[in-house]
């Protein structure tokens, strides 16, 4: 009986640690100097974002000169119009980290309206969370009411097919293997 309790405890700890390891920090644009006005449409941060899969639990990281710029999280309408007056969140420390707490679209613009107008902005879509729970709006607190449709701005996009296996699939596979190993050893 004690061995089964030990195995169950091991599974629980392993599953929780695997969940933590699967989240990652992503530097916006792929390098520290990317939060700037793009020199051409092909260097748009949205082009960069289209090549990635963002997941609930990932963290976006911006590096920039806090004396010259900032990052605003805004609604879809504010994103389209580069409206900097009423952001949902304002980051200005030069080393901004935003944890993606829910699935769906996120919109970010430069705190400088002129920079935004010239293309310094980012729109990403976060894939559904591993297990279906989307968490709170900006924090990982207990479930809260659904975010305002105006802030979401668009429907959630389904994950593209043919990509790498999802984190949940990897976790189930690893847990299955460890479970089989535990049964064989007992």
UniProtKB/Swiss-Prot annotation:
The lineage of its organism: Eukaryota, Viridiplantae, Streptophyta, Embryophyta, Tracheophyta. The gene is ENODL13. Pfam families: Cu_bind_like. Residues 1-23 form the signal peptide. Disruption phenotype: No visible phenotype. Plants lacking ENODL11, ENODL12, ENODL13, ENODL14 and ENODL15 have a reduced seed set due to aborted ovules as a result of pollen tubes failling to rupture and release their sperm cell cargo. One of its GO terms (cellular component) is plasma membrane. Disulfide bonds join 82-116. It is a lipid-anchor; GPI-anchor. May act as a carbohydrate transporter. Required, together with ENODL11, ENODL12, ENODL13, ENODL14 and ENODL15, for male-female communication and pollen tube reception and burst at the synergid cell surface of the female gametophyte. Belongs to the early nodulin-like (ENODL) family. This is Early nodulin-like protein 13.
């Amino acid at each position: 009986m004690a061995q089964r309790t030990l195995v169950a405890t091991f599974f629980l700890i392993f599953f929780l640690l695997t969940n933590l390891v699967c989240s990652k920090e992503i530097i916006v644009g792929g390098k520290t100097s990317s939060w700037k006005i793009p020199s051409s449409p092909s260097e748009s941060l949205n082009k960069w974002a289209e090549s990635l899969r963002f997941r609930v639990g990932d963290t976006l990281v911006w590096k920039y000169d806090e004396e010259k710029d900032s990052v605003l999280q805004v609604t879809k309408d504010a994103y389209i119009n580069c409206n900097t007056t009423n952001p949902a969140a304002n980051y200005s420390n030069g080393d901004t980290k935003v944890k993606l707490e829910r699935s769906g679209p996120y919109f970010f613009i430069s705190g400088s309206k002129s920079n935004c107008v010239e293309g310094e902005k980012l729109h990403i879509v976060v894939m559904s969370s591993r297990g279906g729970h989307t968490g709170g709006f900006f924090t990982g607190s207990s479930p809260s009411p659904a975010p305002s449709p105006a802030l979401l701005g668009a429907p959630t996009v389904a994950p593209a097919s043919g990509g790498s296996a999802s984190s949940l699939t990897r976790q189930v596979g690893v847990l299955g293997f460890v479970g089989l190993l535990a049964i064989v050893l007992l």
